[in-house]
Amino acid sequence: MEEKTEVQAEIVQKKEMATVSQITDSGNVMLSEIYIENAAKQIEFRARLIQTALKALKPHDIQDFDGKPYIEGEGAARIMSVIRGFKVGEAKFVIETIHPHYFVETSIPMEFMGATTVALGDCSTADPFFCGKDGKSGQYKKHLDRTGSEAMSARLILGDAKKKARENAISRGVTELLGLKGLSWTILAD
């Protein structure tokens, strides 16, 4: 009796393995000519889309970041204005204060043609743009001269840092969703 149960269990297990679904077209063919042709068309369309996106950029939209091209926030905005269909969700911010600076991180859900990502961006007010090389100039000094209040200047600097972190996140999201990650200067020159 025990032998019969083992044989039945083995037969059931073999039937389950045989019914594992396979990727097929309507004719139950694993890889069809139509499937391959459609994949080739997608590659061609994506290449044309990327070329169109890159044509929208101005020279100052691309910065050299450790020897690699980096699309700035303005460049990402230009791409989004030409290539429609990007969906940008609500930014969530995490702010860390290490006196006298703010460190801002943001995450933004993004979508383009069915592909999704959570784009990450960050910014620090310790950057010389915000506080100058001496720690008391840059944007902070401009806000302080204009408002006369250190508290108000700090609040305005935090707003600037949040804006920059959001721009960085959107730039990274556009780059990732379009497949522009890992671009080289030689590819851009072509």
Over which residues does each language-model region extend?
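Polyanion-binding surfaces on beta-sheet-dominated domains and ring/shell assemblies
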Residues: 2-190
